[in-house]
């Protein structure tokens, strides 16, 4: 499945994560490397949340950011979140994808999706942020794994 393929690609990026550069950011407005990688790992767990809830309300504290300090923590959580998402997806009927899922900030509706659209959005977010991580890697001379084919680093290995 696409979720599995995106997990495998994400795993390659997390396997290359440099523990020595947790606080690196290419610009003052950019996320630091560890929070970016943490966010990517969290996104892999979003399908499970989206399938087992009807909404997420930031104001109510439904989202609690994770804080990691090492590649090993990232890898462990990535595997855990993937397993939970795969389990939720395996128990889902096709009709279940038509259910509603929304994001709120208190009374303000931020996003209103079908469960299918919410998962599709999560996969888009995963691709977007993983590409950011690839730029960070390139700027710090860390090998960039290929996502949908070999990267420049892999072509010459």
Can you describe what each PLM-predicted range is?
Residues 49, 54-93:
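Helix-adjacent hinge/juxtasegments
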Residues 2-5, 9, 76-87, 128:
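A non-catalytic, amphipathic alpha-helix used as a structural packing/dimerization or gating element
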Residues 91-108:
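Acidic catalytic patch
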Residues 4-11, 21-64, 104-157:
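Short, contiguous alpha-helical
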């Amino acid at each position: 499945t696409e979720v599995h393929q995106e997990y495998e690609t994400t795993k390659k990026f997390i396997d290359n994560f440099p523990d020595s550069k947790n606080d690196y950011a290419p610009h003052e407005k950019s996320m630091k490397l560890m929070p970016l990688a943490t966010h990517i790992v969290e996104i892999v767990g979003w399908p499970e949340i989206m399938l087992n809830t009807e909404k997420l309300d930031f104001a109510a504290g439904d989202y609690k950011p994770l804080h990691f300090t090492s590649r090993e923590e990232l890898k462990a959580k990535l595997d855990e979140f993937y397993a939970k998402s795969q389990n939720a997806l395996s128990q889902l009927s096709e009709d279940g994808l038509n259910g509603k899922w929304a994001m709120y900030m208190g009374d303000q509706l931020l996003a209103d999706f079908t469960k299918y659209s919410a998962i599709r959005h999560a996969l888009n977010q995963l691709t977007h942020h993983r590409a950011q991580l690839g730029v960070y890697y390139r700027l710090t001379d860390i090998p960039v794994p290929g996502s949908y084919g070999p990267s420049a680093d892999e072509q010459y290995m």
